[in-house]
């Protein structure tokens, strides 16, 4: 998307490919390092190929320049989302070619303007959606995906804002038409979207929020939802014990057998929305068995049954809405409403933790283990913390040590920086 010098781009591609194959690149320095022009290079997290954490590298890469209609942003912080794990595994429809720079959202300072860009100036503080390439020191993205941020919003908050709050708002108000007195069930209530859903529900009178989350998160998030259940419990019976008719809205990021459970909980005229499929991610790499099992467990929906029971089933993908279906204008209106709520102190992004670019492996492992409460942020200017001796221990979701997998020995080391 952004224009780069052909020679520099080719050199960077060779660096990535040779490093992934453990071969020294031609023309490197005598110490084995790889250099681009210091004045026009940047650091970027690069996914060399689909698979485990060992596919991630930190490279010096040619800096992009804005094309017509684009802004160049000096990145301060980037958001890390569950979709980034699925991209790393290649566990998405029509995955892009590797090598690539992951990431879909960031915040920072406008550094340059492409031709025909209006409404922005160099030095503006902004947050943005990016169609990949966000995990870098500099990004270029079309102006329609860029939004100015309030003066009192930190860059880490701004990086935690777009994906989570826009997703939550569109599902609640554009798709499900949330109104006073309704009830909502949200899975992964302790995650970034889950916390955004809880906060937005609090802006509507008398909304009851049912949430599922890992038990260790309950103390931290108990005040944000009305009723909280363990993610492994029989939440269907728990919800019906409290509300015999069920709920008006189900927000499902899990998929699998939760689809049927969610539909069974809907009241007449209720809406079930699928916006993720995290149950398909079990191991560090893509698993055909996990994918097949999760897909097999999805209840086959009969339209006649929906008609008879007066139920609505929907899906939502923010990235597809933005980058494939051309609804940037709709999303800009949503962002403006959300910033208004932020300025009124009614919503505030929940940031779980900040990670250096060098620590992206550890950050991804934390979100894979469902250990986060709120959003994980890559802080571009953060210095990586020293590795602890026991940081390399890998555990399952049940807290038990997992067996070593092929390539795991490399995953237990800090991601190397390839100059």
Swiss-Prot record:
Single GO MF descriptor: oxidoreductase activity
Entry EC number(s): 1.-.-.-
Q: Which residues carry this modification: Phosphothreonine?
A: 393, 395
Keyword Nucleotide-binding appears in the UniProt entry:
no
Which residues get modified to Phosphoserine? 392, 396
Q: What class of enzyme is it?
A: oxidoreductase
Query: InterPro entries given for it?
Result: ADH-like_N, GroES-like_sf, NAD(P)-bd_dom_sf, PKS_ER, Quin_OxRdtase/zeta-crystal_CS, SV-ATPase_mito-regulator
- Acidic residues: bias regions: 397-407
What is the name listed in the Swiss-Prot or TrEMBL entry for this protein? Synaptic vesicle membrane protein VAT-1 homolog-like
Give the gene that encodes this protein: VAT1L
Which Pfam family name is an example for this entry? ADH_N
Q: In which tissues is it expressed?
A: Detected in skin fibroblasts.
The family this protein is said to belong to = Belongs to the zinc-containing alcohol dehydrogenase family. Quinone oxidoreductase subfamily.
Task: Give the organism, scientific name.
Answer: Homo sapiens
Provide the residue span(s) of the region labelled Disordered. 1-36, 384-419
For this UniProt record, the keywords arranged alphabetically read as follows: Oxidoreductase, Phosphoprotein
Q: Which CDD domains does this chain map to?
A: MDR3
Superkingdom is Eukaryota
Biased composition, class Basic and acidic residues, residue ranges: 1-25, 408-419
């Amino acid at each position: 998307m952004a224009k780069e010098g052909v020679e520099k781009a080719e050199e960077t591609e060779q660096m990535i490919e040779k490093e992934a194959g453990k071969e020294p690149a031609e023309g490197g320095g005598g110490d084995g390092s790889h250099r681009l022009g210091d004045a026009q290079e940047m650091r970027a997290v690069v996914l060399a190929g689909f698979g485990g954490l060992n596919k991630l590298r930190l490279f010096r890469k040619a800096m992009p320049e804005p094309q017509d209609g684009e802004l160049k942003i000096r990145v301060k912080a980037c958001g890390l989302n569950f979709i980034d794990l699925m991209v790393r595994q290649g566990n998405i429809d029509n995955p892009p070619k590797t090598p690539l720079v992951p990431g879909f959202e960031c915040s920072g300072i406008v550094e340059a303007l492409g031709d025909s860009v209006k409404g922005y100036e160099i030095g503006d503080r902004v947050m943005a959606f990016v169609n990949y390439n966000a995990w870098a020191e500099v990004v270029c993205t079309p102006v329609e995906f860029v939004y100015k941020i309030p003066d009192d919003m930190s860059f880490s908050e701004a990086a935690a804002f777009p994906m989570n709050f826009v997703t939550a708002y569109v599902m609640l108000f554009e798709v499900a038409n949330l109104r006073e007195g309704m009830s909502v069930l949200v899975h992964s209530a302790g995650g970034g979207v889950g916390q955004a859903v809880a906060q937005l529900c609090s802006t509507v009178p008398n909304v009851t929020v049912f949430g599922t989350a890992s038990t260790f998160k309950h103390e931290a998030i108990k005040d944000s939802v009305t009723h909280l259940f363990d993610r492994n419990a029989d939440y269907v019976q728990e919800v019906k014990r409290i509300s015999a008719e069920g709920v008006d809205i189900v927000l499902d990021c899990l998929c699998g057998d939760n689809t049927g459970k969610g539909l069974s909980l809907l009241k007449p005229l209720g809406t079930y929305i699928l916006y993720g499929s995290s149950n398909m991610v079990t191991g560090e790499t893509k698993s055909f068995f996990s994918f097949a099992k999760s897909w097999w467990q999805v209840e086959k929906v009969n339209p006649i049954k929906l008609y008879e029971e007066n139920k609505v089933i929907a899906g939502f993908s923010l990235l597809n809405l933005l980058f494939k279906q051309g609804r940037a204008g709709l999303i800009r209106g949503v962002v403006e409403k959300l910033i208004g709520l932020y300025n009124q102190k009614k919503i505030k992004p929940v940031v779980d933790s900040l990670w250096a670019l060098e620590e992206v492996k550890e950050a991804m492992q934390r979100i894979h283990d469902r250990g986060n409460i709120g959003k994980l942020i890559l802080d571009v200017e953060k210095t990586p913390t020293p590795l602890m001796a026991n940081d390399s221990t890998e555990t399952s979701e049940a807290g038990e040590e997992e067996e070593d997998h092929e390539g795991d020995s490399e995953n237990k080391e800090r991601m190397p920086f390839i100059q």
